[in-house]
């Protein structure tokens, strides 16, 4: 076991919107330390949403997407005797945000649009409108937890 809990590093807000969640999103989007490319993709997607999103601004769509994809419950495996049970547990707020960001990026990368900017923009729009793959992932996670509600007393 570790001696002490790792300190949570403070993330600086992004320079354009002053939003810490956008900084975390950019950091998750980044490959091989290429932050400038990840930043271009993120801001490009927000600008594309501004053009196509209708009455909502890009930053509002982004915030709605993150909120809609945040999971409330998830399941963890727990061995009891010889059996492994999927035990539903509540998700901490920091993990909710991290999972939402991770799922949106993962499903955006799997989309069929041409550029990553388009993929990310359309995934964010879908998530904000409560549809799309990342929102479905949240729903599936919740259904899994509901199905295993009987094992909730194994929580630790």
From Swiss-Prot:
It comes from the Bacteria. One of its GO terms (molecular function) is structural constituent of ribosome. One of its GO terms (biological process) is translation. Pfam families: Ribosomal_S7. InterPro entries: Ribosomal_uS7 (IPR000235), Ribosomal_uS7_bac/org-type (IPR005717), Ribosomal_uS7_CS (IPR020606), Ribosomal_uS7_dom (IPR023798), Ribosomal_uS7_dom_sf (IPR036823). GO terms for cellular component: small ribosomal subunit. Keywords: Ribonucleoprotein, Ribosomal protein, RNA-binding, rRNA-binding, tRNA-binding. PANTHER family: RIBOSOMAL PROTEIN S7 (PTHR11205). Part of the 30S ribosomal subunit. Contacts proteins S9 and S11. One of the primary rRNA binding proteins, it binds directly to 16S rRNA where it nucleates assembly of the head domain of the 30S subunit. Is located at the subunit interface close to the decoding center, probably blocks exit of the E-site tRNA. Belongs to the universal ribosomal protein uS7 family. NCBIfam families: rpsG_bact. This is Small ribosomal subunit protein uS7. The gene is rpsG.
